[in-house]
């Protein structure tokens, strides 16, 4: 959705939203797998570019927010070094909150233009929630990086790691 919103803004080519594109197929990770490098198969199922973007948005919203209102990061946000912060499903990411709020707020009008008022409202609602949760992550000197699965803050002013993170 991020790149799609950029494309729509720059090109104004709204017809792309209806272009059929195949989905990809890949088996879910097995319990002993943390990641997998592979070439996924193209599915016989296709969907418009808008449908693909909606599925990506729904994936984030299905994971939902953690205890602090931030998106759950699973086994990583943009920073691969954080891949164990949320591996039990409870870790949260401030960066992901900022990014999700930005993308959702930009994608909401796209939903509106597509006549998808319910998804438009849902995107606006979650964008506001994630932005507010990120604001609450201010630690007095910088923003926290996130929270571990056990609820401990990551990158607080009392930590030695993540003190000078570029995104802080």
Regions found by a protein language model. Give the residues of each.
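An acidic intrinsically disordered interaction segment
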Residues: 53-72, 132-147
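Glycine-centered secondary-structure boundary/capping sites
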Residues: 12, 67-72, 115, 151
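A structural signal for alpha-helical segments
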Residues: 41-44, 48, 88, 95, ...
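Carbohydrate-binding/catalytic loop surfaces
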Residues: 23-44, 70-91, 141-167
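Catalytic cores of carbohydrate-active enzymes
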Residues: 99-168
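Aromatic-rich carbohydrate-recognition surfaces in CAZymes
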Residues: 1-68, 93-97, 101
């Amino acid at each position: 959705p991020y790149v799609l919103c950029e494309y729509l803004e720059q090109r104004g080519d709204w017809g792309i939203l209806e272009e059929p594109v195949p989905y990809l197929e890949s088996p879910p990770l097995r319990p002993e797998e943390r990641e997998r490098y592979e070439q996924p198969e193209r599915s016989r199922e296709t969907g418009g570019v808008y449908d693909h973007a909606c599925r990506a948005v729904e994936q984030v919203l299905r994971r939902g927010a953690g205890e602090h209102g931030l998106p759950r990061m699973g086994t990583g946000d943009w920073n691969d070094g954080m891949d164990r912060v949320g591996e039990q499903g409870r870790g949260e990411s401030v960066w992901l909150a900022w990014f999700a709020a930005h993308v959702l707020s930009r994608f909401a009008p796209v939903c509106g233009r597509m006549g998808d008022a319910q998804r438009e409202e849902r995107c606006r609602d979650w964008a506001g929630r994630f932005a507010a949760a990120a604001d609450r992550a201010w630690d007095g000197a910088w923003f926290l990086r996130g929270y571990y699965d056990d609820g401990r803050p990551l990158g607080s002013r009392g930590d030695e790691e993540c003190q000078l993170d570029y995104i802080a």
